[in-house]
Each structure stands twice: as structure tokens, then as C-alpha cells.
Amino acid sequence: MENELKKDFTRRLSQCNSGEMIVIIYDIFFAYVDDIRQAHCTGDHDGQKDAIRNAQSVLDELIGSLNFSYPISHNLYKLYMFCKNELSRAMYENRLDGVQEAEHIMHRLYTSFVEVAKQDKSAPLMKNTQQVYAGMTYAR
């Protein structure tokens, strides 16, 4: 993942609420999927393995944030684990079909979380962060 993209994710995370945070985590997953594809196309097997591990770490973060007191969390857990297994299969078979399957599932979930995030009017999670306006920062 490029440094500029990392900075963008950091900025977005510093200003998001809880609903937006999940969307940003999904965006990070998709950035790693792009890294997987790029490494595969260039024949960089080690880079591909690293990108797959990074994508799996994002899935681990999503799994860790599940609240199992809600029934939907059990379904999300199964989907996230399936995606992790597909990424593992892609790593060991050196093919992209498992990556594509995981990306497809995650994209369908992503569209739902985007809609939920639009309805979330809660306050930002981080306090005392700088506000960014068109590339300029202003202290609160």
C-alpha cells in the first residue's frame, strides 16, 4: 500500500465515527486486494503473500470487533472466516480465484455497511484531533 493511501486512511480514521470506521476498514481490505492483484501480475510471490497476510489481518480486525450478543454477528463471523480461508487458498495455489471470491463477498457486505454508516449520526471516535479543510489543518 502506498504511503499516500496510508496517510489518507489515517486522516479518515482520525475523523470518523463508529459507522464510518467499519467502512474505512473495508476500504483498507480492498486496498490490500489491489496489492495482491498487482503483486500477482508482476510475479512477485513474496509481495503477494505479504498482501494476502495483510488482508487477512484486516479480516481478523473485523472478526475481533464483532459483538456476538447480536445474531447477525454469527453470520458475519462465518463470512469473514470463509474469506480468510479463500485468501489462504489463493496464497498456496498462487491463483486469484480465491481472492476474487473473497472480494465479491466483502464488496456485498461493504455496500450494506456504507448504507448503515450514512444513518450513523454519532460523534467522531477521536477527540482533540485536527480538522482538515482542503489540505490545511486547523487545531481544535
Stretch-by-stretch model annotation:
Residues 13-23, 46, 70, 74:
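Short, solvent-exposed segments of well-ordered alpha helices
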Residues 37-40, 62-67, 91:
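Membrane-helix exit/interface motif
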